[in-house]
């Protein structure tokens, strides 16, 4: 079986994009993992699938498969690549596209300068809906936010749980480049307080409109950028009274701009979406 694919990235967060409307996609978990493998497959942080939606008020369905073969709820950088893909392929001529994801509907808009703005929806801040189990954990209040203390590698680290359609734990650090992200990230990802695991975000505040961010993504490890992670980090920073909208988020892969006007309002994310190359791969050549 041969698959046509497009390799894309959003601020260095890289994806395999597959048209699931004009070709059949019936892959096993092992085949998804093999596609994402950087040594034996194409290589990517995640695989994005374009499908038809069953809803009349939605243009497409958007599915995301992690490098570990598991399907996840949302990916903001991937959403920007998604709308660039369907536009460049002539699958839509709309400037604003509504897309169905696992937990709802998002709106994607192409800007005149080539950037893409994604309406990411409202953040979910109720712990049980992240989901996050807070029972027995120490807490402390900062402005409008409640922080929870997690035991991580012998230290208590204070995190803000936020869902952007997928779960995030946001931690503020003094120097994100010196912080042990690769050591603490896996511990937080698999912490028992997050029943579905979690994306661990480490944010350094530069000023009230600028941050530096690293994210250890659930099922993918540290990536060059994480769109939902950038949104969750800015929401946490604003709720803690440390940031003002809009916020420029510097990641290792590039910059994102995040805007949020507070409770009851959606988060807006703007950033790049770039096509790297296209090709065809024979699944029979991949390791089982």
Swiss-Prot record:
Disulfide bonds: none
Keywords for this protein: Amino-acid biosynthesis, Cytoplasm, Isomerase, Lysine biosynthesis
Domain of life of the source: Bacteria
The protein's enzyme class: isomerase
InterPro entries referenced in this protein's UniProt entry, alphabetically: DAP_epimerase_AS, DAP_epimerase_DapF
Residues at the active site: 75 (proton donor), 226 (proton acceptor)
Ligand binding (substrate): 13, 46, 66, 76-77, 166, 199, 217-218, 227-228
Family matches, as PROSITE patterns: DAP_EPIMERASE
Site description Could be important to modulate the pK values of the two catalytic cysteine residues, residues in chain: 168, 217
Pathway entry: Amino-acid biosynthesis; L-lysine biosynthesis via DAP pathway; DL-2,6-diaminopimelate from LL-2,6-diaminopimelate: step 1/1
Reactions this protein catalyses: (2S,6S)-2,6-diaminopimelate = meso-2,6-diaminopimelate
Gene3D superfamilies, per database record: Diaminopimelate Epimerase, Chain A, domain 1 (3.10.310.10)
Record's keyword annotation contains Disulfide bond: no
EC assignment: 5.1.1.7
BP GO annotations: lysine biosynthetic process via diaminopimelate
Compartments it resides in: Cytoplasm
GO molecular function: diaminopimelate epimerase activity
Primary location class: cytoplasm
GO cellular component, one term: cytosol
Subunit structure, as described in the record: Homodimer.
Function according to Swiss-Prot or TrEMBL: Catalyzes the stereoinversion of LL-2,6-diaminopimelate (L,L-DAP) to meso-diaminopimelate (meso-DAP), a precursor of L-lysine and an essential component of the bacterial peptidoglycan.
Family statement drawn from the similarity comment of this UniProt entry: Belongs to the diaminopimelate epimerase family.
HAMAP family xref list: DAP_epimerase (MF_00197)
Annotated protein name in UniProt: Diaminopimelate epimerase
Origin species: Cupriavidus metallidurans (strain ATCC 43123 / DSM 2839 / NBRC 102507 / CH34) (Ralstonia metallidurans)
Gene: dapF
